[in-house]
């Protein structure tokens, strides 16, 4: 809701991982990014950090190695995102008490911003880059951009039913694909 005010409180920083190998990472190693980001956050704040791995990737040796490394950092916690587990916590529940989220280009940043939770976007490919902090150093005073302008902008990235029915959408896509 663009009219929902930005939150100014919260209990922790929610660091949201992305699916390993996801194209939106542009070749970046999500494990290295997560470890580096935890260490960078810790340089700027002592707030509790909760790491939320992507729900479609878990229980690998690399995942467990990362978990071991980051949990050695003071007040860092790991929240599994396995829907089948009895202690599963939804992203909506986690956003309720989050000070802010930190994302690379994850769609979770969209959920955060829509719900008034500030976000730190670590890549220009993030859909919430315009309404997010872009520097971890701002974590204690995250940017809270104009959500109304942002929602208008992203709404114009979609096609209407009429544009599908008229063929305008296909003509546009076809031109991009085939010249």
Where are these regions (language model features)?
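Conserved alpha-helical elements of sugar-nucleotide-dependent glycosyltransferases
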Residues: 29-37
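Short, well-ordered alpha-helix to beta-strand connector turns
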Residues: 10, 46, 74, 97-98, ...
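Short, solvent-exposed loop/turn segments at secondary-structure junctions
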Residues: 18-22, 55-58, 84, 107-109, ...
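A nucleotide-sugar donor-handling region in carbohydrate enzymes
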Residues: 1-30
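Catalytic donor nucleotide-activated moiety binding site of glycosyltransferases and closely related
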Residues: 38-86
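Leloir-type glycosyltransferase catalytic cores
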Residues: 1-10, 129-179
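A donor-sugar binding/catalytic signature common to diverse glycosyltransferases
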Residues: 86-133
């Amino acid at each position: 809701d663009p009219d929902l005010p930005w939150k100014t409180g919260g209990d922790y920083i929610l660091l949201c991982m992305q699916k390993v190998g996801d194209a939106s990472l542009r070749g970046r190693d999500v494990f290295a990014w997560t470890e580096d980001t935890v260490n960078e956050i810790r340089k700027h704040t002592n707030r509790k950090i909760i790491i939320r791995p992507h729900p479609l990737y878990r229980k690998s040796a690399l995942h467990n190695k990362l978990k071991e490394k980051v949990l050695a950092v003071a007040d860092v916690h790991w929240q599994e995102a396995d829907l089948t587990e009895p202690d599963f916590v939804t992203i909506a529940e986690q956003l309720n008490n989050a000070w802010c989220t930190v994302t690379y280009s994850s769609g979770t940043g969209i959920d955060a911003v829509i719900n008034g939770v500030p976000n730190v976007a670590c890549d220009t490919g993030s859909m919430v880059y315009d309404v997010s902090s872009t520097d971890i150093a701002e974590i204690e005073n995250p940017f809270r951009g104009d959500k109304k302008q942002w929602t208008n902008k992203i709404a114009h990235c979609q096609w209407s039913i009429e544009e599908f029915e008229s063929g305008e959408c296909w003509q546009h896509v076809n031109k991009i694909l085939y010249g």
